[in-house]
Curated annotation (Swiss-Prot):
Catalyzes the reversible oxidation of malate to oxaloacetate. Belongs to the LDH/MDH superfamily. MDH type 2 family. It comes from the Bacteria. The gene is mdh. It catalyses: (S)-malate + NAD(+) = oxaloacetate + NADH + H(+). This is Malate dehydrogenase. Keywords: NAD, Oxidoreductase, Tricarboxylic acid cycle. The keyword NAD applies.
């Protein structure tokens, strides 16, 4: 079982949060 999909999802969520807090 690979954790890469989980890491990728977490990175996407973090990017969304940074984008929202920037606006």
């Amino acid at each position: 079982m690979s954790i890469l999909p989980l890491v990728h999802a977490m990175a996407n969520v973090r990017g969304d949060i940074e984008y929202l807090t920037e606006a």
